[in-house]
Curated annotation (Swiss-Prot):
GO terms for biological process: protein homooligomerization. Belongs to the mimivirus BTB/WD family. The lineage of its organism: Viruses, Varidnaviria, Bamfordvirae, Nucleocytoviricota, Megaviricetes. It comes from the Viruses. Residues 80-149 form the BTB domain. InterPro entries: SKP1/BTB/POZ_sf, T1-type_BTB. Signal peptide: none annotated. This is Putative BTB/POZ domain-containing protein L275. SUPFAM superfamilies: POZ domain.
Length: 435
């Protein structure tokens, strides 16, 4: 007996119960065959996966990539080039093979020694918690997790940490929130901002010119940062001072750098602290950095005047778009290169790129910038799922979000790398400001 499209169908899972209509599932024969005399389908499947499949059939914009294995068992045809099945803790995932290999060392070895199973590796159980694995997947895609304590699991899978290479001497403008900053020389009015001896480097933080200080190190900053000590002159000598009170804003270990807000050498803060004597703010504040931390460069930044701030600066256009085709059917490629002179307008020589994003059907791995063949920046990209774009994370330090601005100089060459060879079009979006 045929069923009407409005006939309710109950679906029972391992840990839940759902209802849909026959009209939603009737085009999928495998699901129809599972309907019993009580108009019920019993599935040995988790409820969250069934819910995703049903919403997909109802026309919602949701992806079934990760659960394609279960979807295909129910008669849906979900397939993508370069994707394979893996089994983690009894749950099968459909993943981009090249992408997961590039991010997790574990899977390079796993695929190498089990290549005879390609493309379905689900017969081999990776004995780890699948719920934690899903957080690992979110982590390597640049998405936020509710639980950031993944170090043990990331160590197990052998996370390939993105390599950040930054040569600060090539970048003169920075931004953070709504403020813009310009790099200033380390000597103003014949007063040095820092000096060093055989034991440590001393950086003076109480100059009225300085707003931010960025310190780049030669190697990764250790967990124990006792080699960074703040001192304030009190009475007849210097006393150690609390790091947070001294403006230590954030530490980025992946980029081997720290960000410090300079303590103003002025009386501005006295307005908010009426009981504090003015002389308190004129006492020198110093940061002492042990030589074992190996400072590579210290960058002093001055906040640009209010008429130079992004909110008051004339944006030439909300976004410019620059499109670059690459690859061909006979010659696939995994990168595309271009020079700034190809898309920045000569009419605006005094400008900086404020925001940048990349859009491509192919997955982007990282971005490289060279100046006269010298590598000045290597940066990963963050995927923004809601907008289906990648944002270039040139320099982002924790929640402070300090970013480099790219000056309009024609000697800069961009190269965008992809996870696999392809034919595609790269869309480069950017917003520029007058300086």
């Amino acid at each position: 007996m045929s069923k009407s499209s409005t006939c309710p169908i109950t679906i029972k899972s391992i840990n839940g119960r759902f209802q849909t209509t026959f009209g939603t599932i009737k085009q999928f024969n495998k699901m129809v065959e599972l309907i019993d005399t009580n108009n019920t389908i019993n599935l040995d499947m988790d409820s969250d996966r069934i819910e995703k499949i049903l919403n997909y059939l109802r026309g919602y914009n949701c992806s079934l990539k990760l659960i394609a294995y279960d979807a295909n068992k129910l008669g849906l045809d979900i397939s993508y080039d370069g994707y394979v099945y893996i089994n983690v803790g009894g749950r099968v995932y459909y993943v981009d093979k090249d992408f997961i290999k590039s991010k997790l060392e574990f899977f390079k070895i796993f695929f190498k020694y089990n290549n005879h199973c390609h493309p379905d590796y689900s017969g081999i159980v990776i004995d780890r918690d699948y719920r934690v694995f899903e957080k690992v997947l979110r982590h390597i895609k640049g998405k936020q997790n509710d639980n950031h304590n993944l170090s043990t699991e990331l160590d197990y899978y052998g996370l390939n940490k993105p390599i950040h290479i930054i040569e600060p001497s090539y970048f003169n403008h920075y931004s953070m929130k709504k403020n813009m900053y310009v790099k200033i020389p380390s000597t103003i009015d014949d007063k040095n901002f820092y000096c060093k001896d055989d034991i440590e480097t001393m950086i003076y933080l109480s100059y009225k010119y300085i707003s931010l200080i960025v310190i780049f190190f030669e190697k990764e900053i250790p967990e124990d940062i006792s080699g960074l000590q703040f001192y304030r002159f009190v009475g007849h000598g210097f006393g150690e001072y609390d790091k947070k009170s001294c403006g230590l804003k954030s530490i980025s270990k992946s980029q081997n750098m720290i960000l410090i807000h300079s303590i103003p050498y002025s009386t501005e803060h006295i307005k908010n602290n009426k009981n504090t004597k003015e002389s308190y703010y004129h006492r020198p504040l110093e940061l002492h950095v042990n030589k074992n931390l190996n400072i590579r460069e210290v960058v002093f930044l001055e906040k640009m005047s209010i008429d130079k701030q992004p909110d008051n600066v004339t944006c030439i256009k909300d976004y410019f778009l620059f499109k670059k085709n690459f690859g061909s059917e006979g010659g696939l490629t995994d990168f595309v290169s271009f020079n700034l002179s190809e898309f920045l307008f000569v009419d605006y020589p005094q400008c900086a790129i404020k925001k940048m994003y990349l859009k491509s059907n192919s997955k982007i791995s990282h971005v490289e910038i060279k100046c006269n063949n010298n590598l000045v920046l290597n940066s990963p990209v963050n995927y923004i799922g809601t907008k289906d774009i990648y944002r270039i994370t040139f320099l982002t330090v924790s929640k402070s979000r300090l970013n480099l601005l790219i000056d309009n100089r024609t000697d800069l060459n961009f190269t965008v790398y992809f996870h696999r060879k392809c034919v595609d079009q790269l869309i480069f979006g950017y917003k520029i400001l007058r300086l």
